[in-house]
């Protein structure tokens, strides 16, 4: 499926599915589809958990309540095992990150042509439905975590303690302050960059594989049949990938914030 005036070639098909619906140019470009799906899924997550929380009973819970309680307990145990400070906000934050990232990743399970085709009927030429295949979204999440790291580092250790952490580690000598500052600054900045690029790279690669498999349906009968098998196999494997990436993002956030709460 291609946008109007776009050649229906393998290259055009791939390019079409990797192009965001956007307004503006350069630095001021807004990816409308990424914003729509990320915000929409965030609202959906809040609505589901709030609804279940309001209807929760101490008696025999329903299937959805059981599922939500399993997730909450899993995240709570992960926080207890990895976070060594005192902060009541870390568990809710970890739950939000895990569920939000997972739900954005889960959009990759929808066949690549379905939603773009529906959008084309409404006159929308491009539509990327997986927010985490947009590096702007993954960096936004990572920068949010980075801001929390800086905030809690200063709150727990004070400005002087935070500066000492950057200048007197790993070599505790005044002569090594420039070296320490360089090493610690690089380490600090690498945290959000690695968070963002790891999530983006894995989901972008997964989406690209789905697109390449979808191309096989437009060839001969043999490759079309093979495409069905490949898509099913990759779909099953990708469920593990999207869950693992959400878990890794959550766990690294917990670990980084735990380090920020350590007062040496």
From Swiss-Prot:
Residues spanning the membrane: 29-49, 90-110, 134-154, 177-197, 208-228, 235-255
Cross-referenced CDD domains: ATP-synt_Fo_a_6
Keyword Membrane attached: yes
Compartments in which it is found: Cell inner membrane
Keywords: ATP synthesis, Cell inner membrane, Cell membrane, CF(0), Hydrogen ion transport, Ion transport, Membrane, Transmembrane, Transmembrane helix, Transport
Matching Pfam families: ATP-synt_A
Membrane topology term: Multi-pass membrane protein
BP term (GO), one: proton motive force-driven plasma membrane ATP synthesis
Signal peptide range: none
GO cellular component: plasma membrane; proton-transporting ATP synthase complex
Subunit architecture: F-type ATPases have 2 components, CF(1) - the catalytic core - and CF(0) - the membrane proton channel. CF(1) has five subunits: alpha(3), beta(3), gamma(1), delta(1), epsilon(1). CF(0) has three main subunits: a(1), b(2) and c(9-12). The alpha and beta chains form an alternating ring which encloses part of the gamma chain. CF(1) is attached to CF(0) by a central stalk formed by the gamma and epsilon chains, while a peripheral stalk is formed by the delta and b chains.
Biological function: Key component of the proton channel; it plays a direct role in the translocation of protons across the membrane.
Protein name listed in UniProt: ATP synthase subunit a
Species whose genome carries this gene: Shewanella oneidensis (strain ATCC 700550 / JCM 31522 / CIP 106686 / LMG 19005 / NCIMB 14063 / MR-1)
């Amino acid at each position: 499926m291609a946008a109007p005036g776009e050649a229906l070639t393998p290259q055009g098909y791939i390019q079409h599915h990797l192009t965001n619906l956007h307004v503006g140019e350069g630095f001021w470009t807004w990816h409308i589809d990424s914003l729509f799906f990320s915000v929409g899924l965030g609202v959906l997550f809040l609505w589901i958990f709030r609804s279940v929380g309001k209807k929760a009973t101490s008696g025999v819970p329903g299937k959805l309540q059981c599922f939500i309680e399993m997730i909450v307990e899993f995240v709570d145990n992960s926080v207890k095992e990895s976070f060594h400070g005192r902060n009541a906000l870390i568990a809710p934050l970890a739950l939000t990150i895990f569920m939000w990232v997972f739900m954005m990743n889960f959009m990759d399970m929808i066949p690549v042509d379905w939603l773009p085709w529906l959008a084309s009927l409404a006159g929308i030429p491009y539509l990327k439905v997986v927010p985490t295949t947009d590096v702007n979204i993954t960096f936004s999440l990572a920068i949010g975590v980075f801001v929390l790291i800086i905030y809690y580092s200063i709150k727990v250790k004070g400005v002087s303690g935070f500066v000492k952490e950057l200048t007197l580690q790993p070599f505790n000598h005044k002569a090594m302050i420039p070296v320490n500052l360089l090493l610690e600054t690089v380490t600090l900045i690498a945290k959000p960059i690695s968070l963002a690029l790891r999530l983006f790279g894995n989901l972008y690669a997964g989406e690209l594989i789905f697109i390449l498999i979808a191309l096989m349906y437009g060839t001969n009968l043999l490759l079309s049949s093979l495409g069905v098998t490949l898509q099913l196999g990759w779909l099953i494997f990708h469920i593990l990938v999207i869950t693992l990436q959400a878990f890794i993002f959550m766990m690294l956030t917990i670990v980084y914030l735990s380090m920020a709460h350590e007062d040496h």
